[in-house]
């Protein structure tokens, strides 16, 4: 169960040498954590499995069934036990159809799928142990001009969080489809009662970006482009070589990160552009009950359960570029210039810091993409500049033991 002053109990721990940005080298105990039981986010390629300890995988919009991968034995198998099954219909326990997002939660699979030539959507479930595919909710167009392609954020405290997306098209004179209408709404779906509740509707075709949800608290980000801002492509063409692309956002985007109580509707700003908010494009903005963000040189975590903020890490100098992410009960803080990069992993619970070896490069050596209980899937930047996907144990990642990677 979640703890108010830190992540759930660590799964394992070890001692490594640390060299933080502001402390002398010392011995730090590194702890790794199991994946969260709540605020479980849906995935589109790799989905962590608390049941197996590994991953569920599929090829997005190509493969209609899932596979299981065990990083301990480095083996892949299809979770279907029918002899001669082709995994091509709902009678197969590995088959879902065209999956746009999937998660394992409390012993069940939940997925958003598309059907009818991608014009309709359904939210479906089945037990991880196998069984028939059950449709929990579906959205079908009323005519040939409508399309429903709905989204699936994830699950938390017995509810699924979905985006209902309706698009309307018309045919142009040359026979091409032209988008003429958009309607979006964020909804919660009670897994026990089957009740769907609309949380908010779009404004001018946009919805706030959901960072995370914990019990009745949800954190959103809104973004507005300032009036008179140039198009991003035009701006890039005018910049000198080496200009960080996120400078455009810092100059022309107004960000606001805020929490909203789903019962009362009350909102509270966490951070906005009145402070020196440093935005990140990394998708790992939320883990368990925590949200990560940066203001100036300091990285903070917001606790959705206690609705409190903790300053977690401060860089000892200004840097040209920053990035940050949160996973495995740690915040990964990254900084650098066009030629150099430094990175640290900070444990949310005890604030211990270990510096990650970037091998003298201008990027973090392994960029985490997905995690299961004991392993990370990440992008490895090699000497030639080619980026490839590898597995690494969490312990090896924190020890910067990149000899431990495997594919």
Residue positions per predicted region:
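Hydrophobic transmembrane helix bundles of membrane-integrated enzymes that assemble
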Residues: 110-111, 161-162, 189, 260-261, ...
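Repeated scaffold domains used in trafficking and secretory/extracellular systems
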Residues: 40-50, 89-104, 142-157, 204-215, ...
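N-terminal export/targeting and maturation segments
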Residues: 27-63, 211, 284
């Amino acid at each position: 169960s979640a703890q108010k002053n830190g992540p759930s109990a660590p799964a394992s721990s070890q001692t490594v040498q640390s060299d933080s940005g502001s402390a002398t080298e010392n011995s730090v105990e590194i702890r790794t954590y199991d994946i969260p039981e709540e605020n479980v986010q849906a995935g589109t390629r790799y989905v962590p499995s608390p049941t197996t300890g590994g991953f569920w995988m599929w090829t997005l919009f190509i493969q209609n069934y899932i596979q299981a991968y065990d990083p301990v034995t480095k083996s892949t198998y299809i979770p279907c036990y029918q002899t001669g099954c082709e995994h091509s219909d709902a009678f197969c326990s590995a088959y879902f159809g065209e999956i746009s997002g999937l998660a394992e939660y409390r012993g069940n699979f939940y997925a958003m799928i598309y059907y009818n030539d991608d014009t309709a959507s359904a939210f479906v479930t089945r037990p991880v142990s196998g069984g028939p595919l059950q449709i929990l909710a579906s959205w079908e167009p009323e005519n040939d001009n409508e399309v429903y392609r709905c989204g699936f954020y994830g699950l938390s405290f017995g509810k699924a969080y979905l985006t209902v997306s309706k698009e309307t098209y018309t045919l142009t004179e040359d026979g091409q489809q032209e988008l003429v209408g958009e309607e979006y709404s964020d909804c919660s779906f009670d897994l026990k009662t089957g009740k769907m509740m609309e949380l908010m509707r779009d404004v001018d075709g946009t919805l706030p970006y959901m960072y995370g949800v914990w019990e009745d608290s949800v954190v959103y980000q809104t973004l507005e482009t300032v009036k008179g801002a140039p198009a991003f492509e035009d701006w890039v063409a005018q910049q000198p070589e080496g200009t960080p692309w996120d400078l455009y956002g810092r100059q022309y985007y107004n960000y606001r990160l805020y929490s909203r109580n789903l019962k009362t509707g009350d909102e509270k700003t966490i951070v906005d552009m009145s402070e020196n908010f440093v935005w990140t494009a990394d998708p790992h903005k939320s883990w368990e009950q925590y949200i990560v963000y940066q203001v100036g040189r300091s990285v903070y975590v917001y606790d959705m359960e206690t609705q409190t903020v903790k300053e977690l890490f401060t860089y000892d100098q200004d840097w040209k570029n920053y990035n940050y992410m949160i996973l495995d009960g740690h915040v990964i803080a990254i900084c650098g210039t066009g030629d150099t990069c430094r990175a640290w992993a900070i444990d949310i619970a005890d604030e211990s810091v270990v510096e990650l070896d970037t091998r003298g490069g201008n990027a973090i050596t392994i960029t985490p993409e997905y995690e299961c209980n004991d392993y990370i899937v990440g992008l490895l930047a090699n000497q030639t500049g080619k980026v490839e996907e590898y597995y690494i144990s969490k312990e090896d990642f924190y020890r910067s033991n990149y000899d431990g990677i495997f594919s």
